[in-house]
């Protein structure tokens, strides 16, 4: 984390003195940084812990969130992004103000802040902190009660995450997201390989055979009405939820508004959709 912070600082030094430099990375982000930042913004504790937990407890039907996300990123690249960049908007509320009026802009800001403050950020910090407590046994390490360790971990994670954005602006966030994303991608590939090897007593093939022939109902990706993600919801509520998330969610699309041009922005969005 220290190395990522240092590289991010070097990349953004002297570039956060203006509004566009701070909030839009000088409108100079390339496709690689846009894709990396979008993926890391999306891939937080609720995905790593929530979706894995859902697959373990039920089946693979929760992958529907990722399947419909790919469609949403295509819509973002070819329908929404050209309009955002054509108007040189800095935020989605600014776009809504131009499209409708100031009342709609203010209402959207209030709704976004309530959603981030009461739903998104608390769930991410809470789930991430529980994972850290389990991995490093923080209560025993610091000799403090579990509740205190949880609160301390939440504060530390929140402060570490805020440092990038507050002092480095959007470009620092994009750079750090991309660098962390490389490590996460490597680890994400290594974990199932190592897990299958351990399950197969050193053989990935044997491990894969065991998975394919044990509790096979968990490999079902077509969710029933009793699963967390019923199949029918892919064509009703879920597709609209993903269209909101990938096309109009401020903290996701902010990276695309900072693209150096439309082509780079579209490539970045489509690249993130490919990995989804």
What are these regions (language model features)?
Residues 6-29, 83-90, 94, 104, ...:
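Membrane-helix boundary/linker segments in multi-pass transporters
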Residues 1-48, 165-168, 181, 187, ...:
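Membrane-interface "cap" regions at the ends of multi-pass membrane proteins
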Residues 36, 111-115, 176, 271-272:
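Hydrophobic alpha-helical segments of secondary membrane carriers
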Residues 153-157, 175-179, 268-271:
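Hydrophobic core positions of alpha-helical segments in small-molecule transporters
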Residues 5, 39, 61-165, 237-245:
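Helix-loop-helix module between adjacent transmembrane segments
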Residues 1-4, 48, 72-79, 88-89, ...:
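Membrane-embedded alpha-helical core segments of multi-pass
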Residues 12, 56, 80-86, 130, ...:
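Membrane-water interface regions at transmembrane-helix termini and the short interhelical loops
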Residues 26-29, 33, 50-64, 97, ...:
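Loop-to-helix junctions at membrane interfaces in multi-pass transport proteins
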């Amino acid at each position: 984390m220290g190395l990522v912070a240092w590289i991010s600082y070097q990349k953004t030094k002297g570039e956060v003195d203006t509004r566009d430099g701070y909030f839009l990375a000088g409108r100079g982000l390339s496709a690689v940084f846009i894709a990396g930042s979008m993926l890391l913004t999306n891939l937080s504790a609720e995905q790593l812990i929530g979706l894995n937990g859902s697959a373990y407890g039920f089946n693979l039907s929760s992958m529907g969130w990722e399947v419909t996300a790919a469609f949403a990123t295509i819509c973002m690249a070819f329908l929404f992004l050209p309009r955002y960049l054509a108007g040189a908007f800095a935020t989605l509320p600014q776009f809504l103000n131009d499209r409708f009026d100031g009342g709609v802009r203010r209402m959207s800001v209030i709704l976004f802040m309530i959603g981030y403050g009461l739903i998104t950020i608390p769930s991410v910090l809470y789930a991430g902190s529980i994972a850290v407590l389990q991995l490093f046994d923080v209560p025993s390490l610091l000799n403090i009660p579990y509740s205190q360790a949880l609160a301390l971990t939440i504060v530390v994670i929140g402060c570490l995450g805020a440092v990038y954005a507050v002092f480095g602006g959007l470009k620092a966030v994009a750079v750090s997201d991309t660098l962390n994303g490389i490590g996460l991608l490597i680890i994400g590939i290594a974990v199932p390989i190592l897990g299958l090897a351990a399950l197969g007593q050193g053989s990935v093939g044997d491990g894969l055979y065991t998975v394919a022939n044990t509790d096979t109902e968990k490999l079902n990706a077509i969710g029933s009405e009793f699963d967390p993600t019923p199949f029918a919801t892919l064509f009703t509520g879920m597709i609209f939820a993903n269209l909101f998330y990938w096309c109009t969610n401020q903290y996701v699309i902010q990276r695309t508004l900072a693209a150096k041009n439309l082509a780079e922005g579209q490539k970045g969005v489509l690249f993130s959709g490919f990995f989804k």
